[in-house]
């Protein structure tokens, strides 16, 4: 399904040294409306909000669970279709949208479906990836249902997919075995850097405090091979020797970002075990760290946060979108109230902000 919008999302990469940079973080209330138009029957609610530059003038936005169907006056119909797993939106340089999912318009399903085990529902939530030579290299996390309620799910594994960027058809997939060897949830941040590909993930302890680990690989014949794992001092071929990256002083979200900004490596995350409303950044000179320069970039302020039983999580950076010395970011919001998801649709739509790059890297 393709929905046309009358706007343009051109990625601006101007020289910030020639402009006066507004030091204030700018809230962009219109951006999610561009990606989630209320009418047209497409995706009108979701989380994840992970983007990848497709390198052809288009960007891919990946959603976790999502709602389909019109939203009128911030309300959605009780029979609105809800998809567990993943759906994608592609937006081109002219602002035209293409929504990717399986199934039918009347019964939409996740775009990349997981094989079922016949015991409990199994699905993929999106990780991250990159594009090279017309191929999207994408990591997806597989989960299954283990109980009732919003958090009745369990991580199973990480799979590495390759897709044709033009058709978005799957070329192949394989299990990323390291994730089950060392319990690191790899693939939630992927960084191409100086001829190698760095794949990051978190490992949480029994209290939910998460540390960041990194592996790196070579891209040979359009496929990631020869993975090694950072042990805190050097790279090892044994995934079980992986150790946390030094210098990250906050518990990092399950989904987070590592991007290159102004020749610095920047990690951005919400505080997983502290105040989840706080969005932090750290910088390093190398992908494996050590990281430093902790910055509180933004504090989430939502009117009705308590009244609407809201939650916020998984801040994302969209480095392909730059303007006036700022980079586009977002954070996800949700509610513990299933009723409110229909009565107030905006409770399940990402919030976009423009953050001064200097605020991160200086």
Task: Give residue spans per PLM region.
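Sec-dependent signal peptide recognition
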Residues: 1-4
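C-terminal motif of bacterial Sec signal peptides marking the signal peptidase cleavage site
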Residues: 8-11
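Beta-rich carbohydrate-recognition and catalytic domains
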Residues: 17-44, 54-122, 131-181, 201-251, ...
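Short alpha-helical segments and helix-capping/turn motifs at coil-helix boundaries
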Residues: 35-38, 44-49, 122-126, 184-185, ...
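Extended, non-transmembrane interaction/recognition domains
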Residues: 182-186, 196-201
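Repeated scaffold domains used in trafficking and secretory/extracellular systems
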Residues: 49, 127, 180-189, 253-256
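Bacterial signal peptide processing site
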Residues: 13-15
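Conserved beta-strand position repeated across blades of beta-propeller domains
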Residues: 52, 130, 189-192, 257-260, ...
